[in-house]
Amino acid sequence: MIDRNGYRANVGIILLNSQNQVFWGKRARQDSWQFPQGGIKSGETPTEAMYRELAEETGLQPVHVEILGRTREWLRYDVPACWTRRDWRKNYRGQKQIWFLLRLLGRDSDVSLETCAHPEFDAWRWNQYWVELESVVEFKRQVYRQALTELSRLLDHEAGLGNDRAYREPLEPVEKNRKKSSDTRQS
């Protein structure tokens, strides 16, 4: 669903564990890390799309998570033409996203990256809420900052995650591994 301004409706997911660490997925066959995200299909609500994308990319089901909140407005980023499908280039500018903040109620072992034929991620890890975003593809960094900042208000009182904690801890590379192991996540 591309709107008249050229933005595809999409959802993004910031998933927290019980220590308020954030789930990061390593893009399959790439060196970039990102949050789970994906397009909203025709007839789907953002919440329905979020649960579908969560299941497709992490194997987690609604019973495994609790919704803590979502962004108030659409957050947008433009996609460079070299990253755009050739048949979309005429009408497509980028993504507009509603971001959800979720709490994992299940266990790490509930995460499975192999729930579909072409997994989005080939490794995953937990990391601190505020991290350096160098491992995120450049054109997505600003929207990540916006989503993390807006949704941190839901955790400020509970966990002391004030907005002044500016992206200090870098994501460190890990071994490629389709299945989560103690080597691919930070405790």
Curated annotation (Swiss-Prot):
Residues 166-187 are annotated as: Disordered. Its cofactor is a divalent metal cation. Keywords: Hydrolase. Pfam families: NUDIX. CDD domains: NUDIX_Ap4A_hydrolase_plant_like (cd03671). Its EC number is 3.6.1.-. Gene3D superfamilies: Nucleoside Triphosphate Pyrophosphohydrolase (3.90.79.10). A motif (Nudix box) lies at residues 38-59. InterPro entries: Nudix_hydrolase (IPR020476), NUDIX_hydrolase-like_dom_sf (IPR015797), NUDIX_hydrolase_CS (IPR020084), NUDIX_hydrolase_dom (IPR000086), RppH (IPR022927). Residues 6-149 form the Nudix hydrolase domain. One of its GO terms (molecular function) is pyrophosphatase activity. PANTHER family: ADP-RIBOSE PYROPHOSPHATASE, DIHYDRONEOPTERIN TRIPHOSPHATE DIPHOSPHATASE. NCBIfam families: PRK00714.1-2 (NF001935), PRK00714.1-4 (NF001937), PRK00714.1-5 (NF001938). Accelerates the degradation of transcripts by removing pyrophosphate from the 5'-end of triphosphorylated RNA, leading to a more labile monophosphorylated state that can stimulate subsequent ribonuclease cleavage. Belongs to the Nudix hydrolase family. RppH subfamily. This is RNA pyrophosphohydrolase.
